[in-house]
Amino acid sequence: MRPSPSLASHARTCSSPPSSGSRITATRTAFRISLDKLGLDYLDLWLVHQPFNDYYGSWRAMEELVDAGLVRAIGVSNFYPDRYYDLVCHNRVVPAVNQLRLNPYDQRRDTREISARYGTVLQAWSPLGQGGAVLKDPVLVSIAREHGKSVPQVILRWLVQTGVSVVVKSVHEDRLRENIDIFDFALTHAQIDAINALDRRETGNGGPDHRDPAMLDFLRTFE
């Protein structure tokens, strides 16, 4: 038995042959390579990186890996509500996780609603807005001052307290410790409402919009 912590990885959906059969085979091969490199006998979580190319073929191969006990859970990343719902409707296993950009300025309420309906956990990447204007927002600064915490801690607490898992990147030990130190306080309902009101619906999110034909043409250059 492997001890904690749990390990997750992404299954890329670029750089692959176009047919479903080829995609299923390519996914199986990619999984074995990842497992060998990690020196493990199973993964806790494996994600489809983006809704592009034959991600249905990838998903069905991943379902087989779950059945075989080689992956404990499978999920998706960067899936908008329409792509997420389509995947749920036409496949056997519901994604355990949908990992996407989510922060006070980009709250993805439509995705949160449909994910909750099917029991998929939302996991926020870039929850601190990549250190941008959100960290200087006066509402967040005021709430942080009330609790004697930093703005990043308030944002992370808001996400966790409202049921969102978080992925926070840092190479500094002091910041890593700060990011973990969010369980000794709780936001009030009024404070949560104030943060919810900051949503700017910035769904362009600084990453690929897989509904944009121009972006899909760009992604094809990596195949």
Can you say where each PLM-predicted feature lies in the sequence?
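Solvent-exposed, non-membrane alpha-helical residues enriched in polar/charged side chains
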Residues: 1, 5, 32-35, 63, ...
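N-terminal binding-site loop/beta-alpha segment at the start of enzyme catalytic domains
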Residues: 1-14, 130, 221-223
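Short secondary-structure boundary/capping segments
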Residues: 6-8, 37, 112-114
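Active-site acidic short loop of glycosyltransferases
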Residues: 11, 40-41, 92-93
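A short, structured active-site edge motif that brings together acidic residues
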Residues: 12-24, 44-51, 78, 102
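Short, acidic/polar
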Residues: 24-39, 57, 84, 107
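CE4/NodB-like, metal-dependent polysaccharide N-deacetylase domain
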Residues: 27-48, 64-68, 120
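Beta/alpha (TIM)-barrel catalytic core signal, keyed to glycine-rich beta->alpha loops juxtaposed to Asp/Glu
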Residues: 50-223
